[in-house]
């Protein structure tokens, strides 16, 4: 498991099928899939609905922040990602 993070959040790759995002006391596991070819990882953004802890809806603003932070960290480490 690779862990990346800065500025109050952490992004972890969870095997070949997920990205764990942690921010303060909240966390969410985002469905993803490792690929071969020009794209390394596809992340299923539409499935991002609820924080795991605490169980609360993720707002539109939080979704965009999560997307920006995950993209920034993974691309910084050389991964080519696609959001679906």
Region roles according to the model:
Residues 1-18, 23-84:
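Cysteine-centric segments in proteins
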